[in-house]
Swiss-Prot record:
Protein name: Adherens junction-associated protein 1
InterPro entries from the UniProt entry: AJAP1, AJAP1_PANP_C
Composition skew (Low complexity), residue ranges: 121-146, 248-263
NAD found in the keyword field: no
Length: 412
């Protein structure tokens, strides 16, 4: 376009010679633009340094559920080599998009390959190399379709197996789950077997005798047949645990038994927990024992105190009786003035201190006797106070008379 404008300007300069300066300026501008555009045109031309920078390709998958294995490597959108090959061998068959394959049914996947491989352009039918390449591509497509069908079957089997992930197909024996509590053995008679069927059956706990009865009645219903076959497989072998090296023998319960009555009419007894006693608990036994010990200790203490207090009361009575006897003896000693019997000072003072009534009577009874004697023997008192010693009878009688007079004055 700009070349045509340049030619028009040159013709105008020829027609109008007065405007030659403006035409020369336009010619210079056009030459500069050509000089700038020529390197870009050289880079686009074919040559040894020509390289097409295509998009980075993703790593090819070995197989896929949707599209299957790839039959040929994808080519870039445009390249000179592809154009040359298209000129030499005719148009190249393009790959179908993945989105269109994904929405087609699986039954048509097998028919896509041969049909695509058999449809050849007329140019390809004329040339023998193109025919050989087409037959090879058709064989590759059919092989890919067969492999794709096998992968689809394997995928179906895999999805079918995921529904029974808790079931072991090696022997038809169910595996124990981790949520169940492993109870201890409950004996040979009450041994229980547990089965966990996947799906809608739910966990069931049946005894060995009941499993044998169900094996006999397999011809009644289909459900009874399925449960009986599974039960017979389990009763013949051993119940497999989660670990392959740990196996539970037949007759040992691995799950909590049900409390519903069995078909025999006998209630199934629950398993016994280790360490559990049938009677009282441990803390109750300890409480009862401590209370009995305290009661026995209280009884023993009461008996000991009674035995200790009985002799002490007897001794108190004896001491009181002894004091009364001493008082009577003291009263008799005050009225008896024989020289052979001389009361001691302890007996006299204890008698007067204990009971004043006895002392008053004793003193009043003895006053006339001592009064008469003191009237006749005044000199003897003086002699005794002067230091002259008297006889033994006077020496014993004077203190008694003196003490009795003084006590009589004090008390009366």
């Amino acid at each position: 376009m700009w070349i045509q404008q340049l030619l028009g300007l040159s013709s105008m300069s020829i027609r109008w010679p007065g405007r030659s300066l403006g035409s020369h300026a336009w010619i210079l501008i056009a030459m500069l633009q050509l000089a700038v555009d020529f390197p870009s045109c050289d880079s686009l031309g074919p040559g040894p340094e020509f390289r097409l920078l295509s998009r980075p390709q993703r790593p090819q998958r070995l197989w896929s559920l949707r599209s299957g294995p790839p039959t040929r490597l994808p080519t870039p959108a445009w390249s000179p080599r592809a154009a040359r090959a298209e000129r030499a061998h005719g148009p190249i068959q393009m790959q179908t998009p993945r989105a269109r394959r994904a929405h087609r049914p699986r039954d048509q996947v097998a028919t896509l390959g041969p049909k695509g491989g058999l449809t050849k352009p007329p140019a390809a039918t004329r040339s023998s190399p193109s025919l050989a390449s087409a037959t090879a591509s058709s064989s590759i497509v059919t092989a890919g379709a067969a492999e794709h069908q096998g992968l689809l079957r394997r995928g179906r089997r895999h999805t079918h197996d995921t529904e029974f992930n808790d079931f072991d197909f090696r022997g038809g024996r169910p595996t124990t789950e981790t949520e169940f509590i492993a109870w201890g053995p409950t004996g040979d008679e009450d041994a229980l077997e547990s089965n966990t069927f996947p799906g809608g059956f739910g966990p069931t706990t049946v005894s060995i005798l009941q499993t044998r009865k169900t094996t006999v009645a397999t011809t009644t219903t289909t459900t009874a047949a399925s449960t009986a076959t599974a039960m017979t497989l389990q009763t013949k072998g051993v119940t497999e645990s989660l670990d392959p090296w740990k196996r539970t023998p037949v007759g040992v319960s691995t799950t909590e038994p049900s409390t519903s009555p069995s078909s025999n009419g006998k209630d199934i007894q629950p398993p016994r927990i280790l360490g559990e006693t049938s009677g009282l608990a441990v803390h109750q036994i300890i409480t009862i024992t401590v209370s009995l010990i305290m009661v026995i200790a209280a009884l023993i203490t009461t008996l000991v105190l009674k035995n200790c207090c009985a002799p002490s009361g007897h001794t108190r009575r004896n001491s009181h009786q002894r004091k009364m006897n001493q008082q009577e003896e003291s009263c008799q000693n005050l009225t008896d003035f024989t020289p052979a019997r001389v009361p001691s000072s302890v007996d006299i003072f204890t008698a007067y201190n204990e009971t004043l009534q006895c002392s008053h009577e004793c003193v009043r009874a003895s006053v006339p006797v001592y009064a008469d004697e003191t009237l006749h023997s005044t000199g003897e008192y003086k002699s005794t106070f002067n230091g002259n010693r008297t006889s033994s009878a006077d020496r014993h009688l004077i203190p008694v008379a003196f003490v009795s007079e003084k006590w009589f004055e004090i008390s009366c």
